[in-house]
Amino acid sequence: SGKFGTPECVYRASEQGKSVSFPRVSPDGKYLMFTLSDYGNFSIWHPESELCLLTMDTGEIRFLNEVNSNDVESFHTWSSSGRWFVFSSKRLDGLWARPFFASFDPETGKAGKPFLMPQKDPDFYDTFTKTYNLPELIKQPVRNGNEMIKAIH
């Protein structure tokens, strides 16, 4: 019909005194991954920020303990297959958000051990002073900035 149904709240973070940001449904529609923090929308600045997973058909919510660390986990993006995701984390030094990748099993809802995006120079992250706040996965090479949106979707 091209129309939306009645809105439905699937999780009330405010009941736990928390805030949700970056909710993203998995490509198969089975899961909703989101960032949970104590307050606000700029979770990258909150060390307590963690990734959570809601199972859509049961409403069960759990912390993604297999990827969360003692520091910030924030913005995340599913791969087009739903078998991988990337997220920003400050787990290395508490200062700079770095892109970590993890596999995901849609049958079990479990993530694999996260790993940092490899670089040619093993010391790259020791001297790189920029942050990966919003990592995105793309499906094709980006030849120029005007084509970025096509590569993401």
Feature map (PLM): residue ranges:
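Sequence signature of WD/YWTD-type beta-propeller architectures
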Residues: 1-153
